[in-house]
Amino acid sequence: VLTFFGEYRGSFYNTGFWWVNFLMSAKNISLRARNLNAEPIKVNDKTGNPIMIGLVLVWRLKRDEIYRSVFDIDATADNSGIVTQGSRMKMLENFVSVQSDAALRQVAGCYAYDDNTADGDTVTLRSSSEEISDLLEERLSERLAIAGIEVVEARINYLAYAPEIAAVMLRRQQADAIISARE
């Protein structure tokens, strides 16, 4: 990302030897795909049951909107007052982590963990992984677009009842299985 006295002048992607005005400053940003393996967080599902849910996210910076990651996300300077590529990427990773937690909480709160009705065709976190993953990708894309970040893939990698109610819910599932087996 090239700036001329703090004003954005363009992005440069080519390798090799190139002449650039010496008054322009360049900020290097990696375009590689990155992974985020979010630790499971405790949220309430649609029915109010506490669950533990985690996600795996693959993301990268959009080539055409890389300037957004430089100007729209605040990066802290080191002791010498210079923002390094490493600190800028850490701030982007932190931004992605916070936004992914918020999107995961939002999606988990919209659906029940499991279907307790007789019809069995409602969308739940446990049985409808494709629909949930698509919705999660959509929510993450909305949140991360302001930083020029593209969501490559988002999946739920951990889903369980919270420890305080896990035993009770297991007994409930076993009882439902016994009742349905008798019918």
Model-flagged regions — what are they?
Residues 1-35:
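Interfacial loop/beta elements and low-complexity acidic/Ser/Thr-rich segments
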Residues 12, 16, 67, 164:
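Short acidic, gly/pro-rich beta-turn/loop elements at beta-sheet edges
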Residues 31-158:
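Amphipathic, interface-forming alpha-helical segments with heptad-repeat character
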Residues 161:
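Short acidic loop-to-helix transition motifs that present clustered carboxylates
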Residues 164-183:
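Long, charge-rich amphipathic alpha-helical coiled-coil "stalk/tentacle" segments
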